[in-house]
Amino acid sequence: MYKDIKVDPAQLEAALDARLKIRAGFDKPTAGMAAGMTQVNMISVPKEWAYDFLLYAHRNPQSCPVLDVLEEGIYATKLAADSDIRTDFPRYRIWKDGEMVDEVTDAREIYNAHPDLVTFLIGCSFSFETALQEAGIEVRHIHDDTNVPMYLSNIECEPAGRISGNMVVSMRPIPSHQISEAVKITARMPSVHGAPVHIGHPESLGISDVNKPDFGDASRIEAGEIPVFWACGVTPQAAVMNSKIPFAISHAPGYMFITDIPDRAWMG
């Protein structure tokens, strides 16, 4: 599929430049980088747990849309040329028995010490933000140069084998008159989380204070704006915590891998 997608050479260059910048030490959230190019989340689990996770993702496609799977010992993805998933995310989280024990900017040594890890690359809602902006909908965390707010919700994912957990959601404040357009745009892109899972009432998701996200930064919500929530690719990290997987590596929330695939490739 991917080799047949026509990409503007300038966009390809921007994506490669972003990956090289990250590889050289860039350490900030990636929303808005290489605009128009798909970004992905990541989770690496031991081979013994890989089938359970693949089934978990299959049963929960809105929060865990798998775009690529890398077998143990493979670190380059077909989603991008000259790629290395051990260096091309700005920041990684290291997990042991469901607890985060470290955060690093280069994961090569850790992958080398755990050669049995299978890696899942998962669609990211950053990939529909250019389309929102082109429709005149402000993406607040890009405008304010902050990280997107993310929350552990009370929505239970469908379990698979030994893996279970709740959905993580991301939030974007949208003016009330633009919500229908935001829904239409994002619904066309199910491979990067698709339409919102909830609009308007954080408490219905178990969120007691929208200004205190579990991951990322709080967003300004102006008069006339409504909080809109989408499924989020940090959901696998919630599953790692809940299921106490013995070892895992993930991206840090908001710190993504930038691919060579344009966002429009996922539009239905």
Swiss-Prot record:
GO MF assignments: lyase activity
Alphabetized UniProt keyword annotations: Lyase
EC number: 4.2.1.-
A Pfam match: D-Glu_cyclase
Record bears the keyword Iron: no
Signal peptide span: none
Gene3D superfamilies: PSTPO5379-like (3.40.1640.10), PSTPO5379-like domain (3.30.2040.10)
SUPFAM superfamilies from the UniProt entry: PSTPO5379-like (SSF160920)
Family: Belongs to the D-glutamate cyclase family.
Record NCBIfam families: PRK05463.1 (NF003969)
Protein name from the UniProt record: Putative hydro-lyase ACICU_01268
Annotated organism of origin: Acinetobacter baumannii (strain ACICU)
